[in-house]
Every structure is written in structure tokens, then in C-alpha cells.
Amino acid sequence: MIITFVLAFIIAMSSYGKIKMGSESKPTIGTFRWVAMIMCTLLAGGGVFWSAAEPIFHFITPSPSFSDVKGGTLAAVAPALSQSFLHWGFLAWAVLGTLSTIVLMYAHYNCGVKLRPRALLYPILGDKLENHWIGSVIDACSIIAVAAGTIGPIGFLATQLSYSLTVLTGLESSLMSQIIILTVIVSIYSVSAFSGMDKGLQWLSRMNVIGAVALLVAILVLGPTGFIFKEFGMAFGTYIQHLPEMSLSTADPSWNSWWTWFFWGWFIGFAPMMAIFIARISQGRSIRELIITVAIIAPIATNFWFSSLGGTGIFLELQTPGSISQPLQEAGLPAVLLASLAQLPFSFLLIPAFLVLTTTFVATTGDSMAYSIAMAVEGTDTPSRYQRLFWAVMMGVVAGVLLIAGDGGLNALQSFIVITAVPVSFLVGVTFITGPIAVLRMKSAELESKSSVDCTKSVTV
């Protein structure tokens, strides 16, 4: 993941960053909508669920990288946030949509290859995999991995909403209540997937960003504004300073398997299909625009979001020890968001607003990934609405099965995500080679003033 980020950043800052991707000279989707669709698809419900829960967990129990820091103290704030930044920062975003997207856009728009995961190997294998069974296996593994990565947020949201309803209404949180909530969520994003990218998905993404910004402003106004900005700056500095050692740490395998390896397995599993989705909406964008947006702007925005929600919870815990840690200990991660918001002014408005935002975030991810899977299966940019609907519903069904298998807990969901990402990691790793090759060939085509390039010839530097 470090290599992906470094390579992508070097390409973006070089003269190759000016290369326009796709068959259109100008972007086909406005910048605001483009950024909104990218961010909302990855953040999903995790952007709300984990942004509140993860920092407070690392604050109470510092990660192995900061084992010398005493938990629950002011000194533990920056390390806690910086550990969260690692999981949701530059490296995670880079692996999702930089080199892999460049390769797919080259293969599809320059060489006419179908937009499928197997196309990530096109720069080195040509069309050998187009009709080969190995190509089908690659596509199948990628579909399973992204389905798992999408099912995770759907399941997380079901547990979050079920717990919230228990606290707000007194109704018992049970597996049945989670399944009912899951059914409602799946219905929402299935309708959006059926409506298509130009209607349901773009509308959902736009509303998500507007809602997220509004709620972020509310947190900054009603919460500990100075504390949030101060600790964000300190945590970001700590993150940059300790990035190499945190990302390469293997000090505690059991801890890593629950945190770092889980998150990175999640994002790697997402990568091929996320790249397909970004490639579909990025025609007319330059390589530099893509990389700066995906690997720089999006991670920083995500980190500030984590600082705002997670930092608020940490501040409240510092002011009143036990106010956040006690609900966390008693009810687990889903309790943190509610415990934090309940202590702010106008909590009766903030709590339902955040729950609605979490739901629409997950709906955006379910919608976009159903669209990407349908594209990979049909091999077309505009898959049929029934194909999109089928995959939207199937992801919900599997999420329900995993919730039942895990008795409503998170362990089954997390294990499913990590296991399915293993074979995909090899495919994503190849982009270290195919990414630069694709860039060189697109540059060659640009210099020759061609709309397409001889995709079989070698490129000399």
C-alpha cells in the first residue's frame, strides 16, 4: 500500500500527471458530483460508524505503535486519532482508486477492453484473459471481495440502528430487529440502483455530501471546536511522523488482525470494483486530478471528519470519565456514536440526523457497487437495471446470513471481509507494474496525437 501511494504521487507530480484519461476531452460529470460520488462510495456507513468508535477505542487502549502512552489521558489523544488516520488515510485511499483506475481507463477507453477486473492485467498480458477461464476466476474473486466489503457496512449499519432504537425507544435490540432494519436499508439502495447512475446514485451522493457538511458544521459549533482543530493538527503531524512504522508494524498480530489488517483487507478487496466505478465516472479527468482527489484530498477530509466525531467523544470522556467508555464497554462499538451525540446540545435533532446520514451513505455504497458488479458481469458501461437490482438484493441477503451466523455481532462480518480480500491482493499488487506501463502508453498516444494507441507495442522510456 505504501508503494501504491508513492508511485501514484510521483506520477501525479510529474509531467505524466497532465495526461487526460478516457475518450472525452472534458469531464462528463461535474467536479462536485464527481468528488461526492467517490467519497460517499468508500466512506459508506463506516465513515460514521467507525469515525465515532475507533478513535475513542485507541484513546482508551493505545495501539502497539504507541504502547508507551498511557490510555485515557490527554497525551493519548493525538496517537489515538493518528492510528485512525492510518486506517482511513493516504495509503487506504491510494490503493482504492489511483493506479488501478489508471490501468482500467487505459485498457477500456484506449484499447477497447471490457471494464472488468481482469483488465488490470491487460498491459502485460494483452487480450489473453479476455475469454480465458482464469480471467473469469479473477472477476469472480473480485466480485466476491467487493460484495463482502459492501456487505460489511450494511451489517455495521444494521447493528448501529438496532442499538440506537433500543436506547431511543426502549425496544429490545435483537437479531430480528437487525434483520428488519437490514431489509429497509436494502430496499432503499435497491431502488436507487434500479433507477440508474444519473438519477438515484448522483442524487444520493449529492445529498450525502450536503448532509455531511451540515452535520460537520453542527458538531463544530455545538462541540469542542478548539479541541477538534488543535488535536487534528497534532494528530496529523504524529501520523506523518510515524506513518512508516505504523504501516509496517507487526508487533501484535492479534491486534492487527482486528484493526489494521481488517481495514486494509477491506479496502484491498474493494479496490478492483471501486476502480471500475471511478473509471466509469472519470472520463475527461487528468491523471493528476484523479490522484490528488483520491489519494490526497479525500484522505485529509476523512481524517478531519474522524477528528470531529471521534475527537468530540474523546473530549467528552476527558471531561467526564466513563461517559463514553462505559457505554463502549457495556454495549460495544455501536454505542459510541449515540453516547457522544447524546451529550451535545440539540441531541434530539443530531441523533436522528446522523442515523439518516449513515443510512444514505450505506445506500450510496450498495448502489454504486451493485452497478460496478453488474458492469463487470455484463462487460458494458450501462448494465441492465435488472442486473443491478439482482446484485443489490444479493448483497443484502448475504449480509443477513452473516448477521444470523454471527448472532448479530461484528466478528462474522469482519472475518468474511478479510478472507475474501486475500486473492484480490495479488491482483492489486500487479498494478505496481501495470500502472506505470499504462501511463507510458497513454503518454505515447498523446504525443502521437492519436485517440487510441497500439496497445500491443512496447514503450521505451
Where are these regions (language model features)?
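Transmembrane helix-loop junctions in multi-pass membrane proteins
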Residues: 12-19, 52-55, 149-166, 189-201, ...
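Hydrophobic, small-residue-rich membrane helices and short re-entrant helix-turn-helix hairpins
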Residues: 116-133, 193-212, 274-297, 381-386, ...
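Membrane-interface loop-to-helix entry segments
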Residues: 1-3, 138-146, 152, 194-222, ...
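Hydrophobic alpha-helical segments of multi-pass membrane transport proteins
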Residues: 3-13, 212-223, 301-311, 352-371, ...
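N-terminal alpha-helical transmembrane segments of multi-pass membrane transport
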Residues: 1-76, 194, 217, 431-447, ...
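Helix-loop-helix module between adjacent transmembrane segments
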Residues: 3-10, 44-47, 87-159, 167-193, ...
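Terminal cytosolic tails of multi-pass membrane transporters
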Residues: 11-25, 293-294, 306-352, 375, ...
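Loop-to-transmembrane helix boundary motifs in multi-pass membrane proteins
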Residues: 126-136, 171-190, 194, 260-269, ...
